[in-house]
From Swiss-Prot:
One of its GO terms (cellular component) is cytoplasm. This is Putative ATP-dependent Clp protease proteolytic subunit-like. SUPFAM superfamilies: ClpP/crotonase (SSF52096). Belongs to the peptidase S14 family. Transmembrane segments: none annotated. Pfam families: CLP_protease. Has lost the two conserved residues (Ser and His) proposed to be part of the active site. Therefore it could be inactive. InterPro entries: ClpP (IPR001907), ClpP/crotonase-like_dom_sf (IPR029045), ClpP/TepA (IPR023562). One of its GO terms (molecular function) is ATP-dependent peptidase activity. The lineage of its organism: Bacteria, Bacillati, Cyanobacteriota, Cyanophyceae, Synechococcales. One of its GO terms (biological process) is protein quality control for misfolded or incompletely synthesized proteins. It comes from Synechococcus elongatus (strain ATCC 33912 / PCC 7942 / FACHB-805) (Anacystis nidulans R2).
Length: 228
């Protein structure tokens, strides 16, 4: 005989209209001072409407909030992103999106631990390298890719020319940030970013993009807070 099936019921606390909805996953992570960048940095308003939020604005808001919450405790910033480009290197966003995140990371007081999981391409690799020195890391099978900005410009010749000048200016800024974060010579960085340069985590350590390769959270300089 089949046993009767009974539904598992949660306790009821007051009127349904006053119930507190369960927190979403990003909010739970933020409570533990964890930020996750898991998509490209789009600049298109149409894409932002489809996604439902502005990735760059969200990351910056989280960084600023965590400093306000506690300016002494570290922030853990996980990165799995192609930055402002697709896997092919074709532009889908402006480099200024990544510059804004890098500037905010340097502006705030808490140490920022950057950890690559999966991949960090182009401007995402720049963000990865912008963590607090000694606290930049990657999981063992991630990929770090260097490449330079592309125009992706369309329209009239004058518009393309204006965009091309902006791309060159952004490239110089990007090389300056990489040089500051890695200690590499800007001329070498210019050569290495001329084409896509794929690196293993060990190679990224040697290059100065990160400081260590992690096998587990125990390898972090400071332990991650546990979920309660």
């Amino acid at each position: 005989m089949l046993e009767s099936i009974q539904a598992v019921q949660a306790p009821y606390y007051g009127d349904v209209s006053y119930r507190t909805p369960p927190p979403d996953l990003p909010s739970l992570l933020l409570k533990e001072r964890i930020i996750y960048l898991g998509m490209p940095l789009f600049s298109s308003d149409d894409v932002k409407r489809q996604v439902g939020f502005d990735v760059t604005e969200l990351i910056i808001a989280q960084l600023l909030y965590l400093e306000f919450d506690n300016p002494e405790k570290p922030i853990y910033f996980y990165i799995n992103s192609t930055g402002t480009s697709w896997y092919t290197g074709d532009a889908i966003g402006y480099e200024t999106e990544a510059f804004a995140i890098c500037d905010t990371m340097r502006y705030i007081k808490p140490p920022v631990h950057t950890i690559c999981i999966g991949q960090a391409m182009g401007t995402a690799a720049m963000i990865l390298s912008g963590g607090t020195p000694g606290n930049r890391a990657s999981l063992p099978h991630a990929t770090i890719v260097l490449n330079q900005p592309r125009t992706g410009a369309q329209g009239q010749a004058s518009d393309i020319q204006i965009r091309a000048k902006e791309v060159l200016a952004n490239k110089r800024t990007m090389l300056e940030i990489f040089a500051r974060n890695t200690g590499q010579d800007p001329d070498r960085l210019a050569r290495d970013t001329d084409r896509m340069l794929y690196m293993t985590p060990a190679q990224a350590v040697e290059y100065g993009l990160i400081d260590r390769v992690l096998d587990s959270r125990k390898d972090l300089p400071a332990p991650l807070p546990s979920f309660s």
